[in-house]
Curated annotation (Swiss-Prot):
Keyword Cell inner membrane recorded: yes
Quaternary assembly: F-type ATPases have 2 components, CF(1) - the catalytic core - and CF(0) - the membrane proton channel. CF(1) has five subunits: alpha(3), beta(3), gamma(1), delta(1), epsilon(1). CF(0) has three main subunits: a, b and c.
Residue ranges crossing the lipid bilayer per the database entry: none
Its job: Produces ATP from ADP in the presence of a proton gradient across the membrane. The gamma chain is believed to be important in regulating ATPase activity and the flow of protons through the CF(0) complex.
An annotated Gene Ontology molecular function: proton-transporting ATP synthase activity, rotational mechanism
Keywords tagged on the record: ATP synthesis, Cell inner membrane, Cell membrane, CF(1), Hydrogen ion transport, Ion transport, Membrane, Transport
Predominant location category: membrane
HAMAP family found in the cross-reference section: ATP_synth_gamma_bact (MF_00815)
Protein name per UniProt: ATP synthase gamma chain
Homology family: Belongs to the ATPase gamma chain family.
Keyword tRNA processing recorded: no
């Protein structure tokens, strides 16, 4: 009977755990939908800023913003690492951290040191354990990222690049593909390549004309900063949507596994109970036969 009592305790424990994982699955599903809406809402802003900056760059080919010029001979690179603040989201953080570590090693092999910006507590913890130089950080963003919380940390990297102290700035995050699939991405944020300003939106280069105040150069300077900030914000929004999707899938898998364990424990309990009843009946029959 002690075995049956122990099994009942295990069943109760797993049932309680399943209630928690099921609740977390539903919460993650709700947050995922909101995160996807924010992610989609951020895309038109970044695209419109890109289109305007592209038009102005074509209209003023003689001016090259520092973000569009490679800093040759510099032995330090920047890395903006976007992760989550919380765990329980499958291998999402592990994948981006592994890819970032590989990028660190590649840069070191080329004689490049790395100065990192951490967005998210998991990435900050990784960088500290790895011994990387962290020059800025943002943690505890919550479920709704705000650009004003990111600007300070991101500006540190942008200023260093503008001053010619970084050879490049890389952005590492998890891109949202769909609920079941997320991709680890490490892309070059600075210097901006010509791909950022290709006329792929179907708008002819001569289709608009503006009067720029105070002058076109000042507007380009401000626009490119806003564009890079929008790229980072988009990466954070994509990462948050990926986080909630991965957490929902992980919690669903945990709930399904708990259900399987409960079924197996219930079967063990029934077998133990049947064995105990059979033993009691055998003892009764044996006692009656002895009489």
């Amino acid at each position: 009977m002690a075995g049956m009592k122990e099994i009942r305790g295990k069943i109760k424990s797993v049932q309680n755990t399943r209630k928690i994982t099921k609740a977390m699955e539903m919460v993650a599903a709700s947050k995922m939908r909101r995160a996807q809406e924010r992610m989609r809402a951020a895309r038109p802003y970044a695209e419109k800023v890109r289109a305007i900056a592209a038009h102005m760059s074509r209209a003023n080919p003689e001016y090259r913003h520092p973000f569009m010029v490679a800093n040759e001979g510099v032995k330090t690179a920047g890395m903006i690492l976007v992760t989550t603040d919380k765990g329980l989201c499958g291998g999402l953080n592990t994948n981006v951290l592994r890819a970032s570590l590989q990028k660190f090693k590649e840069l070191e092999e080329k004689g490049q040191k790395v100065e990192a910006t951490a967005i998210g507590g998991k990435g900050l913890g990784f960088l500290n354990r790895f011994g990387a130089k962290v020059i800025s950080q943002v943690v505890h963003l919550g479920d709704t990222p705000h650009l004003d919380k990111l600007i300070g940390a991101v500006k540190t990297q942008l200023d260093l690049y503008s001053e010619g102290r970084l050879s490049a700035v890389y952005l590492a995050y998890t891109r949202f593909v769909n609920t079941m699939k997320q991709e680890t991405v490490i892309e070059q944020l600075l210097p901006l390549s010509s791909e950022h300003f290709d006329a792929n939106d179907g708008t002819p280069a001569t289709s608009w004309d503006y009067i720029y105040e105070p002058d076109a150069q000042a507007v380009v300077d401000e626009l490119l900063v806003r564009y890079v900030e929008a790229l980072v914000y988009q990466a954070v929004a994509e990462n948050m949507a990926s986080e909630q999707s991965a957490r929902m899938v992980a919690m669903k898998a945990a709930s399904d596994n708990a259900k399987t364990v409960i079924s197996e424990l219930q079967l063990s309990y029934n077998k133990s109970r049947q064995a105990a009843i059979t033993k009691e009946l055998s003892e009764i029959v044996g006692g009656a036969a002895a009489v």
